[in-house]
Curated annotation (Swiss-Prot):
One of its GO terms (cellular component) is GATOR1 complex. It comes from Candida glabrata (strain ATCC 2001 / BCRC 20586 / JCM 3761 / NBRC 0622 / NRRL Y-65 / CBS 138) (Yeast). GO terms for molecular function: GTPase activator activity. Belongs to the IML1 family. This is Vacuolar membrane-associated protein IML1. Keywords: Membrane, Vacuole. The lineage of its organism: Eukaryota, Fungi, Dikarya, Ascomycota, Saccharomycotina.
Amino acid sequence: MFSALRSKNQSNKRSNDDSINSRKDVNELSLGAGGTSTSTNTNHNDSPSIKNKNKNKNKNKTENENIYKLTISSGRSRGTASNTTNANTLVLNAGVAIVGKAPIASSQNEIQTISGQSLQSGIDTNLMTAGFGRSAGIDSTTTVSHDANSVKSRLQRLPTITTSYKEINNGNKPVQVEPQDDSHYTSSLLVDTDPRSNNQPQSISSNAVANVEINRTLQLDLVYHESRVSEKLVMLDLKKLPHIKEGQLCELRTYRKRKSTSARSNKNSRDKKLYFIAHDFDEETRKRCHKFGNISVALGQLQLLLDLPPRSRVWIKPKRKEDTAADLIELHIKDILVNRGDMWCMSSELVDTCVFTGQRIMFLDSIRTTVNGIYKNGKKVLSGYINDNTKIVFRSESSRLLFIIQITNEMWSFDESGEQMFQKMINSFFPKIFNKWKDIETHHSITIAFAISMDMSTSSYKDLKPGQRIKNTTDYYRIVVDQVSVIYWVEIMESLRKEFMEITRELLSRKSDDKKDNELSVIKGRFAPVIKSNILELINFAATTIVDPFRQLDLRHTSTHVMIISPGKGLYDVDYDLLQLSCKKLLSLELTMDLICLSNPPLHVVPLFRYIDYENKLHHCIPPWLNIFFWNDKTKDTNKWTPRCQIYDLQMMGLTDTELVQELELDYLNPSDDINDLQTFLKDYDRDIFLPISTANFKAENISSDPDEEDLKELKKINDKTTTIHKSSTSRNTLTKSQRTNSEENNSIRSRKGDTIIKDPQFVGKISNSSRNNPPYDLSDKSTFEKQFKPKTTFHPSAMIKKTPENMKKLTNPVFQQQYFDIQTDNGLTGNSKNLLIKNTKYLTPIIDEPQTPLVTGNLYRTRFESQSNDNELNENSKLPERGGGTDERRNVSAADTLKDVTKKSSIKDFTQRIFTKFLATTKQSNFNSDGINSSAITEDAVLISDDTDGKTNNNNDFAVYPSSVADGDVSGDNQHRLNNKDSFTSILKPIPRPQLGVKIFKSDINNLSSNENVNSETKQNLLGTRNTINRKQFTASPHFTSSTKNSVSNHSRFIKFDSMDDWIEILEDSIPSYSFLGDDLLPTRWRDVWPKNVFRKYSKWKSFTSPAELPITLKRFPSKYELENNFMLRNHSVTQNWEQEQYKLTTKDLLRNMIYLRLLVGFQICTSSTIEEVESARKGDRDVFAIHKYLRGDLTGTFKIYMLMGSEIHRLHYDNSGTINVERYIEKSERNVFDQVPSYTSFVKTRYDSNYRKTDVDPIHTKRSEFNWNLLDQLLAGYSDPYLYDEWHGFRSKYVILPAEIPSNTFSMVVNGKNETLTTEEIRVEGLRKLIASITRLKLLSVEESKIQKDRKTEIQPEVIFYTGSLFDFLNEQQAQLDSSTLNFKDSIFGDVTKKLNKNIDLKNLAQELQMGENKLNLVTRKWHWKRHANCFVGSEMVNWLIRNFSDIDTRSTAISYGQKLMNDGLFIHVLDKHSFLDGNYFYQISPEFIINMNTVERTNSKNSNTSDNNTLKKTTSRNSTESNLTPLSMRNKVSTMDDDSTQLANTTSANSYKEKKTVVLSNSMLINVDPSSKSYKEELCTVHFDRVHNPEHCFHIRLEWLTTTPKLIDNMLGNWARICEKYGLKLIEIPWNELCTIPSVDPFHTFVQLHLVINPWEDPEFNDPELFAVSKFYYHIHLLKMSGFLLDNRASRFFQRDDADFEIMYSWGKPQFKYAQYIHTTGAYIAEMRENGNIFLAPNNVYMSRVNRANVISKTRSSPTFTVDSRKVVIEFSRTCYSYAKLRAVFLDAKEKWLSNKTVED
């Protein structure tokens, strides 16, 4: 029935092939009257197994079109279809079948036979509609042959295919069938599950129709649209695709023919799969594409990625969002500052969108990011969908990189290949990383410093024990380069080599103490080894740069990354207190850190820190905040053996292999005669080698089989399985057997003061003071052992108690001991006191009657717990296994020592009750003695868990349990499933109460139980839910395993999460080369969201080096409900939006967003842990867990909750419909300040241009992030307080100066009123400043009411800058005189009096009288400009403002200029120099003599009745957010009523009465501006700008910015606009530090400084010593030197303003001037100079500006040299030569002396 139809028999097909254009897909549908028809895939494009038979098609047609060829025959027929995977056959009535691509993706495709004249009811007509009738696309046609009438009649019965036709030709000629309207347009839309498949056609099953919405594949024709048409990347004609809805996720696939292998290698030739959100065509696109395509893709990035011509065929398929969401998205940013608040907002905008690799995303039309990586299920994919759970990581290609190179003794060593470590770094590492930066075109700013720790002791460090540090050390830091652009990488490498060669001479060479030969140098000290180096000190040193979150920002760089280069292997001995301090500090900083080791990786876990606690115990730990990489640039050879241990001494011996063999002969093993089998021998050998000596001494024949010795057998059995979990400082395996024996004996038997310690530390009893001289028990003596340690109760050990070492100092205090321990003097002990080891005679009374003695180590000792309800005696055979091969102080500690951890606030009774109520059963089986102590006892290191626990808990939660390992075969099926299932395992983690002692409990402690020994399930879950603490109450943080196998989980027993804050991970077995089973536990908790799931970290190392990540905005960590209630203090406050903010369109949603935004800026992260839902559901009142959000999207209509965490502080922000935002702050309780435990740290630093090392001005260890008053900050955001009223400003600040630059040639002339005006350079720059101020004024924030009023008022009145030359105080005195004479009596406001207006028809005499004597008269004053004085003149800009304010028919400045020119032509006024026409600017004009009114004959116009209020307004004018302060004249006011108390310090020498009369002069103006005038941002972007109102053109003009939650990129754009305005007028906008130069060393120790001493001291040199001159200006010669060298005055010293003869006090809008020294800026902006009191000049590079202008990438072959760079070194070198050259400096001073003698005047 389905016979093959050969193409040679299809004459009609061949005849039609010539009429078909060169199409890749031809679908032939055969309609037969006598039977069904099938289809054969002829593959014309995508089926590689079938050849293309349409090579000779018509060239006039377009490719990629689909045509359905319907062949009509009276018998059996066969059609062909291309691009079909499951070509489904739709069987119609009368046996006619349409063979093609049916819209179905189900596997249930069955042939349905239809009888009658209609479709089977089970088939949805929409199925056919989607497949054929309702699609848009290319102008395709249907070719019909044979009986056209039959075809017409049959097709008319299928309305979903075609409903009407314009024309059907009769006969057997092919007929072109076209639809009459678009709604029934037949196109080439196909449905397929896989277009690449060659499956035969199948029919549609009615059961499969239900699943067609998601899984169907649609074949569409592609067109492109421009971005001006639509910004959407992909659009669909959804009117013709009814099963796809707006906003639905779809998949787009491309399939293309692979012609060659080279084509496969081309990325553009590969098939692609992308995801997009379905958006409907807009009307323009629908009209344009209705005949050409169904899908439109935006031109640009996506078009280049697809690499398909128009009208190509693509396949789309609807997808489920939850199945397609990406795990992690990486966004790269460059040359911009994106803070974490904007990252949160950007992430919110990206949710529910699709991205593809390489996509450039624009945010606010300013922030450009590039999608660099999309990860899903451990794989990097091309495209992905972003949902709420997708982690979005921001990586910066323009970061500040800090390279800290450890200069240790090993830096001069050679590696195994013979290369010196330093040369390996300089010749391999740095060139490689510079090439990486060049390839990806990064713009990093680089700082490189050497960190050296000099050992000044006389003994060798080899004499120190592991964990001990060198006491007598001195730390040095050499700053090689500081914030240098990568474009200078050649100079950087030269500096590195040079400084390394000089470091030895500088630090090892010291001047001899011999007075006879002072020039003799001796070598003192030596470089410390890397293992004893200052690793934590240098980390704190690097962290000082980002301690202040509100430091002055570099608007072109994002994130700070520290890379520590070390010659070691990642093992360091550190101080315990300093480790705690560093961990606490790093938890609150946004600092990434990498450790790059130049050696080969060792065979132990790294990085590894060793420290000794307060009990002199050695610990190993992993700092998870430190990433480690081992640099090896050589290709790996698996067949070559590489040494992994330090064999440097052996390599340098020069011995040959023969000599080594002769000298290093080893004896053969002498096997024992009693070996029965190999397994026994290996078992005994391992036991003797690896187990403690005491446990290995047990012999089988010493253990009898009587019932009393069952416990001994059990002990022997357990000892065989025990593994050592604490390694000693020296590896046991490297010692000989005799050495190990001696070591163990020394560690086991050691007498201390008042102590008697049993040989085997597993058996420790409490011994009376009288028996201290008795010999220790001999465990080989069975009778003695049975007598003293006969077991009466066996226990199941389930926990380990970890002491809190930080409390030991308090507990060893005699006063404390006497208070809390019952002291007896008799030597006899009775009862149960024999088994407790007492350290001193005063501890003779039993503290705990029956301490639990079994200790848990390794896989733990498995015994049974049998509760003795009536037995209160101490178990004489209490076993205390050792923790490992440590020191005797660690291994032999009694239960009494454990009690030293009790704080002063608790008693012994309460202490023991807290312990036993946590772990022991409170049922009848758990008995307590008269003191309230449970009969089950505790030891130093173990607490036992009863089999019967009722779950009662106490409120003291001081420990956390960390799951460890499970022994093979010891886990039941249910428990094994929990352990192997990560989600299940995590779900059972429950918090339990914690006593005051830190406790370690392994997971294997619980899971090693047999079926009849299981602990109560609730207790077990509790144990698995918490972890150990070290010095404070901590959170619960669930561990995550990367492997679910039993072996990997079992290895986990060697690791313990030491602190639930994830400070570090304590290692009990350090000899583990791989720790992959720890998984995410080794990742920093705060940075865990940076790493993709299931991706090896080694693949991410170059990302960390080249594009470091910013701190993620989310983290999955949160304390349990119990911990939140008991370990945290609650502080709360409420915030409500100020109603005045509504006039600026600020809502409560804006306030909430700003509150979250601000917390993200200072380091908070949004908590996404599932624990939050449990905590929230347990709250009283509102328990809506669905109100917990991660992003703030949409309208704020319902309840909104968000949890944020930083360090030890949690914030809960809750908004309800009342409009109030409630803030709950949970602050972790802390009884110990770690910063008080570490002494001050002194180090020495030598910056780039220093000649000697100097003491640092900052203590990097004690420098920490300050705490914030969040109530105050939230109120500031709500608009209730003025931030300037507080002493300490919390916000961002930046300072800019305007310096002269080269003037463009076309700027010197300008046409005004038809006249060509030629301006001087000074006039051009002054005009540029006016234009800049006008641009700033246009950004002023206006309320809604002000915006409406300004439409009807004068809007072009601008605040003017008062320019002056000469002395500032002379100028201010003139201004004050004018104020006192009441000549300035008009209201200085942009809103003038609209009731009294003049017009242009006014008579000149009347106008002259209004100008001079009117109510709002013009300011006519005497002005001085460069040695010339001009009496009774006014400024052109003031005249323009006066005309606009007072004339009703003048509204614009241009109209005012034209009218002013008319008045000047009429002779009303003239230019003082008769040089210019009337200009709007700082040009002086005078009233013509014939219009001047004699002031002496006119009565004062300022009467008490009319102008009192105006004068009061003028005198009280402030410059902060005041329209009255926006204009000239200079504001002066009484100080007493408005200024703060601090300003009283400015005039201490004046009397109280005269002080009250002083006026306050404000020299700057402030204005609240909107940096987003185009309203592209999602929030109000506000900023306060301060600019000078008084300016000397020979000085710097200042602009200061202050903001809190404004987007930095918008500020950068605004500054760019201002910079372009300045460049047009020969000015340059330069950013400089906000604070004065002398304060920077105490903030940034990396900053480079130069202190210059003048070779000529003008105060002492007879040639220049002039008392008259120095009485006027002490620093006259110094100032002249700076001016001649190109420096301009920036800030005067504060003492300059504190003049006794001044009648006013000078203030600025940004605060009181408090500069200690005068500061100058070089005209290049590269250097800042400060003049010291002793005459020295202090120089520093302007790094904030240098990093902005020198941001070009590393010069590569394809890129030319940067067009503009500033070389700061040239400036300092030239100036230094002048200062140190007698001839050059004398010439400068002689020129200054000549000027003084000529005019005897000194300018400021």
